[in-house]
Amino acid sequence: SHGGKDLAHAIQRLNDLGYRCDLFTLDAKWFVPQSRVRLFVVGSLDSLPVAGWPNADLRPAWLRAFVDRHPNLLVQTLPLPPLEPSQATLKDYVQRLPPSDKRWWDKQRLEIFLTSLSPIQSQRLLRLQAQSELSWATAYRRTRNGRATWEIRADAISGCLRTPRGGSSKQALVEAGDGRVRVRWMTA
């Protein structure tokens, strides 16, 4: 936050205590079907083996740029193994509800959802609907030009949605296939 000033300050404080730091990110999608990127700062009192900047998944370009902008910080990189994304998708975890379950949106709410989709989102939904098997995707509401619209994720994972005030935003779950579509709020 604050253009990297908070991170630079935290690393400098760790450096002042004698720690060298490694920085890397982990995304939950490497373990479960959810995208949730987190930054890790690992401090060591011992000198770390220098690994350069391998594995762009763990150390994206923005992280390298941060380190380049702060040459005074003691940052060294650990040799971390590459991570393979999880093969799990929403279908492996989604709670199966019968069509009669009250949590599915009624026709009126479904129609509002469908009419709020952009042409690209409508095409995405039509492709899912045309499949012979049921599939699941998450959708989230955004405001575009003062109008609420729904966007359906193209992958089979859920996102980590944050509101401008720092809280979480709810996701909808789209179930489509065999010519049908149903939508409801995501459940545990």
Kindly label every feature range from the protein language model.
Residues 175-188:
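Low-complexity, glycine/alanine/valine/leucine- and proline-rich hydrophobic stretches
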Residues 170-174:
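Cytochrome P450 core scaffold surrounding the K-helix E-X-X-R motif
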Residues 48, 166-167:
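Acidic glycine-/aspartate-rich tracts in secreted/extracellular proteins
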Residues 1-153:
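Class I S-adenosyl-L-methionine
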Residues 160-166:
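Short Ser/Thr-interspersed hydrophobic loop/turn segments at strand-loop and sheet-helix junctions
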